[in-house]
Amino acid sequence: MRVAVDVMGGDNAPHVEVEGAVAAAREFGVPVTLVGDAEKVRAELARYDCKGLDIEVWHASEVVGMHDSASDAVRKKKDSSIRIAFELVKGGEAVAVVSAGNSGATMAAGMFVLKRMKGIDRAAIAQLFPTVSGKTLVLDVGGNVDCKPIHLVQFAVMGEVYARFVMGVDNPKVGLLSNGEEASKGNELTRETSALLREKPINYIGYVEGRDIFNGSVDVVVCDGFVGNVALKLSEGLAEAVGKMLKAEIKSSFLSQIGYLLSRKAFNNFKKTVDYAEYGGAPLLGINGVGMICHGGSNPKAIKNAIRFAHEYALKGVNGRMAEKLNESFPGDAREREGAPAPDAGTERVAS
């Protein structure tokens, strides 16, 4: 089961992607196909000892830039590395795609080439957040800035399956992000969504607040892509700021430096917990295949872990489990009764 890696999309492509892919092949035994400018890719590969590693190179003559329109990039740049990577999955040459490129283009390419799963109107980008007791899955974190209640319900069902079969959580708790836990809080979108969620075969616990993402009280947090992207960028900025504050305090006095030396292991464990590279990337849920969207500034460690997670996702057959849960949650014409638009209606607006 090969993983196709878009090696031309990230801020430091193709160096970071190739190094991460080589590490994934060496440490985890994952077969990888590097998609991009073959000459540049092979030049990067020559820097490593790849003997015995299952690594292939697939040429793609075009690159989707970070400022390219997602829809135009997919339709006009037919030989781009990101589109070719998804075409490999469609053709059975790979089981998953990993990309640190334009997130909107990655999402658009996944939906354009592999199409949405039956029963899904909008694909969603999910992200694991560290908590005091483990991890919380938040979706959507940028795929759809405008959502209808039915979209959030679909996100909840997909998130529940991901938590159960990827995170290993038995009967995961699903919450809807709001400005308070009381039923009277929220807006029209959250109130309508909450009513629908109570009818679904999932462990829906009601409204949750932003702080609940990190306190371990909920396993899956559902929101629209606008709110989710703000939460994601806020957490990234906070983690970076806290790190800088700690460094400044440690350097402020001799006693602080002694204290740091005595607590170095604890500091290193904390740093590892909040390091996005440990999580690799954000899975794109709702397409007929596996897609992993990485941060544009990902380092080799992040790419390596994204490849591992994408490979494990495919091995566990999560999409098949998701299809079963969707059929259970939306039997017959339930989607029409709940006001779902036709699957291809509307255009997703992506937060970067």
From Swiss-Prot:
This is Phosphate acyltransferase. Homodimer. Probably interacts with PlsY. Residues 328-339 have a biased composition (Basic and acidic residues). HAMAP family: PlsX. Keywords: Cytoplasm, Lipid biosynthesis, Lipid metabolism, Phospholipid biosynthesis, Phospholipid metabolism, Transferase. It comes from Citrifermentans bemidjiense (strain ATCC BAA-1014 / DSM 16622 / JCM 12645 / Bem). Catalyzes the reversible formation of acyl-phosphate (acyl-PO(4)) from acyl-[acyl-carrier-protein] (acyl-ACP). This enzyme utilizes acyl-ACP as fatty acyl donor, but not acyl-CoA. Pathway: Lipid metabolism; phospholipid metabolism. The lineage of its organism: Bacteria, Pseudomonadati, Thermodesulfobacteriota, Desulfuromonadia, Geobacterales. GO terms for molecular function: phosphate:acyl-[acyl carrier protein] acyltransferase activity. It is found in: Cytoplasm. It catalyses: a fatty acyl-[ACP] + phosphate = an acyl phosphate + holo-[ACP]. It comes from the Bacteria. One of its GO terms (cellular component) is cytoplasm. InterPro entries: FA_synthesis, Phospholipid_synth_PlsX-like. Its main location: cytoplasm. Belongs to the PlsX family. Pfam families: FA_synthesis (PF02504). Residues 328-352 are annotated as: Disordered.
